[in-house]
Design a protein with these regions (language model features):
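Structural and coupling elements of P-loop NTPases
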Residues: 1-337
């Protein structure tokens, strides 16, 4: 595989959110659907005994929050996916801000009941400043939530970005039925609650006008879905990928990460529209990813954070070229040599 082919197939993104919006749970389910794990853990749950994969530190498992960025990767449909799960709490925001310098796109998780919260606004300001493309995932639709159209208006106003829903929920709370995939023009209904494996049975309906839809979700919810999707198509412009890549438009997905609702739809669309590694600006020039010379920067260092971890681990964002094991690289400003240990 050539360097350009390797660059094109990579997708590196961060999952960011206000505390308790479901960021780490979504990360866990993306790993599940991507085949990186076979059973999804949970941040806080009495039913699920397995802890979240990204919460590897003991303090994270004890408190049920993320306090440090975790980096995970998997192969999916020919793409190399790198996920960075970030802390949501303001006390650890510096970690998240540094992580945002190393990603090519972002998924913002929003609690459907609470809407846009303070930390989400601050993180979006950083994304806007860096012109980082964002996708919004409205989470926790299995609980009573705000009206979807009210949420879309709130996202546009509070995050100051145009939105375009690419999926739409069928009710919420106790009557939540699933999500309609506007991007793929089909409906997937999940028939299980809180399944932590990726083998939940589904029903796909490609035509909303089909009477079969009434049989699955009743005539009331079927008619409501038809009206909602018609309104979406009438109010919002067609999805423009170039506008998304310019960070001018945010695709919006709805779902419930803990119940697997809407996660696969998000992942399938993400690998199609998200950017591959982008050029990196420096003080003197723009570094293109396809340049032969290896360049990069350390965006995070773990040191003495967990007794089971190595004493120091540096996280390197490669901006161009290929990193080779057991090879020394000059470190800018310090004139030191860096090598993999």
């Amino acid at each position: 595989m050539t360097l350009q082919e390797e660059i094109t197939r990579r997708r590196t993104f961060a999952v960011i959110a206000h505390p308790d919006a479901g960021k780490t749970t979504l990360t866990e389910k993306l790993l599940l659907f991507g085949g990186a794990i076979h059973v999804a853990g949970a941040v806080k749950s009495n039913k699920i005994k397995k802890g979240a994969t990204s919460d590897f530190m003991e303090i994270e498992r004890q408190r049920g929050i993320s306090v440090a960025t975790s980096v995970m990767g998997f192969e999916y449909q020919g793409r190399k996916i790198n996920i960075l799960d970030t802390p949501g709490h303001e006390d650890f925001a510096e970690d998240t801000y540094r992580t945002l310098t190393a990603v090519d796109s972002v998924i913002i998780v929003i609690d459907g009941a609470k809407g846009v919260e303070s930390q989400t606004r601050k993180l979006m300001d950083v994304c806007r400043m860096r012109q980082t493309p964002v996708i919004v995932f409205v989470n926790k639709l299995d609980r009573p939530c705000k009206d979807p159209f009210d949420l879309l208006d709130e996202i546009e106003k509070e995050l100051r970005i145009r939105v375009r829903p690419l999926s739409f929920p069928i009710s919420s709370g106790d009557t939540f039925k699933g999500v309609y995939n506007i991007y793929e023009k089909n409906l997937t209904l999940f028939t299980s609650d809180e399944r932590q494996t990726a083998d939940a049975s589904t029903v796909e309906i490609n035509d909303l006008a089909s009477p079969e839809l009434d049989e699955y979700i009743t005539e009331r919810y079927a008619n409501q879905l038809r009206e909602d999707t018609e309104l979406v198509e009438g109010v919002y412009d067609a999805f423009d990928r170039e506008a998304y890549l310019r960070a001018e438009l945010a695709p919006v997905f709805f779902g419930s990460a803990v119940n697997n609702f809407g996660v696969k739809e998000l992942l399938e669309c993400f690998i199609r529209i998200a950017p591959s590694p982008r050029p990196a600006p420096t003080e003197t020039r723009i570094v293109e990813p396809a340049e032969a010379k290896m360049t990069g920067f350390v965006f995070k260092i773990h040191a003495n954070m967990d007794p089971n971890h190595r004493d120091r681990i540096a996280f390197l964002k490669i901006c161009s070229g290929t990193f080779e094991r057991n090879k020394n690289y000059p470190v800018s400003y310090t004139h030191l040599r860096a090598h993999e240990t």
